[in-house]
Amino acid sequence: MAGEMVEMEVNESAVGSSKTRVISYLRNAGFLEASDSIAVEEPLAIDILGPDGITVRAGVIMRTPVMDRYLVAGFLYSEGLISGISDIEGFEGVDEDGVSHQNHATVKIGKRIGFNVNSRLLNSACGICGRSTIADLLIRHGKIGTDTRIDSETILGLPTAMGRAQALFLKTGGVHAAALFDVQGRLHAVCEDIGRHNAVDKVVGYTLLEGKDTDNSVLMVSGRAGFEIVEKAFLAGFPIVSSVSAPSSLAIQIAEAVGITLVCFVRNNRFNIYSHPERIIP
């Protein structure tokens, strides 16, 4: 059944992900006061501690402080700074609830990493600046060629299933979401964040740290499907990306080149397929 939840191990109601503020609001030409829940946005500094004892700043991300462990792992993987979970020896500055309450996380890496910090993008708002070409992506991860297929009715049920699990959005109205579904439409995880790319990195980190399969999975996102969303999905091995909103031209180009089925405008009992439609069963 589409939207059946099988293992929601991810807790989006973590303390610190929202704050309450007294606001004034307009009703009937007059102002009233009420409490409003606000999504938290705070910086997270990510450092890498290599085997030589040298610490390098990998980035500073503006994020909602929940599931930082997944965010850090997904970010480092998407950036090509780790090749898999085996590269990570441990986390410092991340508490048992998976959150860095000091807004500073250090990842112990068991291999030497060489990269130019100044040439890397440290802002989660853009993906292509100084980054990958299609050829570079295909070097890191071969073209997706799975024979995975999914029923149209299952695709249509994904937004509702994701929306019901978006606890932080329902509370604040101020965050994006990314979700991991299998091709039977069963929901495995929903990750929310003030940044839509962060939400995807959290899903990617979840699959890495929890050992979840992506070969027969769908990445569902609540916002538009831009280049970086498709790039992250490809590097994580997702054959299908689904969005309730529009794709960008570059996202379509990347999806077509790397073998991803890109399905957008999934709403009101309809959707558009922009690349590799052979995976969708009418």
Curated annotation (Swiss-Prot):
Q: Does the keyword Cytoplasm apply?
A: yes
Q: InterPro entries in the record, alphabetically? A: Cytidine_deaminase-like, FdhD
Coiled coil regions, renumbered to chain: none
| GO MF term list | sulfur carrier activity; sulfurtransferase activity
Subcellular location field: Cytoplasm
GO biological process, alphabetically ordered: Mo-molybdopterin cofactor biosynthetic process
- GO CC term (a single one): cytoplasm
Which residues of the sequence carry a binding annotation for Mo-bis(molybdopterin guanine dinucleotide)? 265-270
Catalytic center residues: 126 (cysteine persulfide intermediate)
Keyword field: Cytoplasm, Molybdenum cofactor biosynthesis
Biological role: Required for formate dehydrogenase (FDH) activity. Acts as a sulfur carrier protein that transfers sulfur from IscS to the molybdenum cofactor prior to its insertion into FDH.
Similarity comment: Belongs to the FdhD family.
The protein's name in its UniProt record: Sulfur carrier protein FdhD
Q: Which organism is it from?
A: Thermoplasma acidophilum (strain ATCC 25905 / DSM 1728 / JCM 9062 / NBRC 15155 / AMRC-C165)
Task: State the encoding gene.
Answer: fdhD
